Design a protein with these regions (language model features):
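Glycine-rich active-site/cofactor-binding loop and its immediate structural neighborhood
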Residues: 6-10, 17-22
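Short loop/turn segments at strand-loop or loop-helix junctions that form parts
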Residues: 10-11, 54
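Long, charge-dense tracts
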Residues: 1-5, 12-14, 41, 46
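Primarily the internal scaffold of c-type cytochrome electron-transfer domains
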Residues: 18-211, 215-352
Length: 354
């Protein structure tokens, strides 16, 4: 099967056996394009403390290569993390080269613990898992089957929402594939949990995954076992240092439950509208591709772009199991804009049909 780098989110038993970015190296026992069974033979434990904490100093750290790239490589200097590093919700990192075994390795120590980045090592969508083509000639933008993406940036753009990421990819003159039914160039998706939360109002206020998924215990410490906030509202959303603050929202458990239910109902409404207008655009694009109708080129291109963005948006949010809770206002704003684009582009295209 290959692509054994996926196993890095299941265990850290063999983390020191890979060269940085999983590149093949004569002294490194493993590489990211090794067969899965070869890597599995080196595994005895699931991921554990050392995934997020340095075993020598207990400092918060990152060991996932692709996230280190996104937070430190010059290719990413114009994207959200590096532009905001040092601000609330964007802790600085110290990248440490660890190549004492004869091949390059890196870790990154967080200036301040922030679970969005510690959990985000796995709960992110990085470019390494996708194949990119150039608009100019439809050829690969990187060497074929290059597991380490030689000459290609493998991190995440830290885009806070699908509109932002779609624009980044398309402005770079890239796409990931072609939708066969419509002929539309697509921008594929991964699970952008970290990117969504980091760019949300909660994330920018310094709230992290563990604030909601590690309930606060009676002694003031957090549980170290993830759970759904909805199972423990009293110790998550409605606790005194969050929305239960007597000088702030002062939510009760019932109010927290009601707010989450409201957000998720709004999500379902927007989801239905996205699918309705996406279906209308798709049907028209199929007719145009099959030659049943002819649309003026400017309107045809806008319709293709609107549908491509719709596909990216659907993939982005449908892989976020919170149903809008991770970024309520961001989801509503984004989905509303995508729906408006679909409606406008579809109507304009229909008006030019010959």
């Amino acid at each position: 099967m290959g692509r054994s780098d996926c196993l890095k989110c299941k265990t850290n038993d063999n983390m020191m056996d890979f060269a940085y970015l999983g590149k093949k190296h004569p002294k490194a026992p493993l590489a990211f394009n090794d067969l899965d069974h070869k890597v599995l033979k080196t595994v005895n434990n699931s991921f554990n403390c050392i995934t997020c904490h340095d075993p020598h100093s207990a400092e918060p750290r990152i060991v996932f290569d692709h996230l280190i790239e996104a937070m430190s490589h010059p290719h990413y200097k114009d994207y959200n993390y590096q532009k905001n590093a040092g601000k609330t919700g964007y802790p600085k990192i110290e990248v440490i080269n660890m190549g004492v075994r004869g091949y390059p390795r890196k870790i990154a120590i967080l200036e301040k613990a922030n679970s969005n980045y510690m959990c985000g090592q796995c709960h992110e969508g990085h470019n390494r898992s996708e194949t990119f083509y150039k608009d100019s000639d439809s050829q690969l933008a990187h060497p074929k089957n290059a597991i380490d993406r030689t000459g290609w940036s493998v991190g995440t753009f830290f885009a806070a929402n699908p509109i932002e990421r779609w624009n980044v990819v398309r402005r770079l003159g890239l796409y990931n594939g072609i939708d066969k039914a419509t002929g539309v160039k697509t921008v594929s998706t991964d699970h952008y949990h970290m990117e969504t939360v980091v760019g949300s109002k909660h994330g920018q206020a310094g709230v992290g995954c563990t604030d909601c998924h590690f309930a606060k215990k009676a002694n003031g410490t957090l549980e170290h076992q993830p759970s759904l906030p909805s199972l423990k509202y009293k110790n998550t959303c409605a606790r005194s240092d969050c929305h239960g603050n007597p000088n702030g929202d002062n939510w009760s458990e019932g109010q927290a439950a009601y707010m989450v239910a409201t957000i998720q109902q709004r999500y379902r409404i927007h989801k239905e509208r996205l699918e309705r207008y996406g279906s209308a655009a798709r049907n028209l694009l199929i007719k145009a591709k099959n030659g049943d109708v002819k649309i003026n080129q400017p309107e045809y291109q806008k319709l293709q772009d609107a549908y491509s963005l719709y596909l990216h948006t659907v993939g982005w949010y449908f892989s976020d199991y919170s149903k809008g809770v991770h970024d309520p206002s961001g989801f509503e704003k984004t989905s509303s804009e995508v729906i408006k684009n679909l409606r406008t582009a579809t109507a304009a295209a229909q008006n030019t049909i010959k």
